[in-house]
Every structure is written in C-alpha cells, then in structure tokens.
Amino acid sequence: MQINREAILADWEAHPMRKPRIAKVTINIGVGESGERLTKAETMLEQLVGQKPIRRRAKQTNRDFGIRRGEPIAVKVTLRGEKAYQMLDRLLEAVDRKLKASNFDEHGNFCFGIQEHINIPGVEYDPEIGIFGMDVCVTLERPGFRVAKRKRQRRKIPTKHKLTKEEGIVFAMEELKAKVEGL
C-alpha cells in the first residue's frame, strides 16, 4: 500500500475542516461467561478508566460455550473528548505504539488488542481481580459529521468528506505517534 503522506498533510493544512479527530474510543472485555469473572472485569475496567462500564448481553445461545441468549458476557466503556485522547495514549504504550495496516478499516477507524491489562502504564497487578485482555476500537471523524447524526435535517456525508484508510494511518502516525507496520 502506497501512502502519499505529504499530500494528505498539505490537504489538512490547507483545509482545517478536513483534519480528522477522535470521535470515540471503545474498550471491550469479552469474558464469555456471567458471574464472578464478569464482575471482576467490570471492577478492573472501572478502576482503569474511571467511568462505569455497561454489560453486553449474548445475542444468541451457544451450547458449546454454555452461553444463553440475553446472558451478560462482556463489559464495555465508551470514552469521548479529552478523556479519550488521554486513555488512548496509555493504551498505545501497552502495545509499544505499534499498529498493523490491517488494523485499519476503509473509513480510517482502527482497532487493536491488548493481551494483558497489566501492560498498561500505571496499572498494578491485583491477585483478587486477575488478568484480562481487551479490545480497543478508535472511531475517527471529521468536523461536520454531526450532519449525519442530528435529529432534524439529517443528511448524508459526501464521499469526498468521508475518511479513507490512508488518512486514518497518517492520523495515527502524526497525531498519536504510532508506528504502522505492513505498509
């Protein structure tokens, strides 16, 4: 994949409304079972982020895993604004600021996994809680995306204003100081 980094940066410099920003950071811990482990994951996530997570329920029954439909099996938390930038900085340190090009989707959003939460700077191991892995998803947007989300006079985002995979990669490299492998 060839990225014209200078052209993208020049476009953002000339048109500030085209420069992407982080819309939200979603942290998900899929425990796979309800009960004590789910409660521990919820406690750990609340301590890590400082915000109460919500429980996610199973969409369908899976007898092989012993999961019933509607049973809580995961916890997630969504961060927005300055809190999202600060938390993402800590989460990227846990993976040594390395991302793969395959982590990015066609709209510039990216996700990465953290194997053990104790790799995050400032987190101590607690034997009562244990160790959990997590998925981190970062959603990017441009100024003006509210047009598609508002209640009145909702409009579609024009194709030329939508983010591309290349712009998402350049944003991660420039703003978040991440190294993207596999280009």
UniProtKB/Swiss-Prot annotation:
The keyword Ribonucleoprotein applies. Disulfide bonds: none annotated. It holds the Pfam family Ribosomal_L5. The keyword Metal-binding does not apply. One of its GO terms (molecular function) is RNA binding. InterPro entries: Ribosomal_uL5, Ribosomal_uL5_arc, Ribosomal_uL5_C, Ribosomal_uL5_dom_sf, Ribosomal_uL5_N. Keywords: Ribonucleoprotein, Ribosomal protein, RNA-binding, rRNA-binding, tRNA-binding. Transmembrane segments: none annotated. GO terms for biological process: translation. Coiled coil: none annotated. One of its GO terms (cellular component) is cytosolic large ribosomal subunit. Part of the 50S ribosomal subunit; contacts the 5S rRNA and probably tRNA. Forms a bridge to the 30S subunit in the 70S ribosome. NCBIfam families: PRK04219.1. Belongs to the universal ribosomal protein uL5 family. This is one of the proteins that bind and probably mediate the attachment of the 5S RNA into the large ribosomal subunit, where it forms part of the central protuberance. In the 70S ribosome it contacts protein S13 of the 30S subunit (bridge B1b), connecting the 2 subunits; this bridge is implicated in subunit movement. May contact the P site tRNA; the 5S rRNA and some of its associated proteins might help stabilize positioning of ribosome-bound tRNAs. This is Large ribosomal subunit protein uL5. The gene is rpl5.
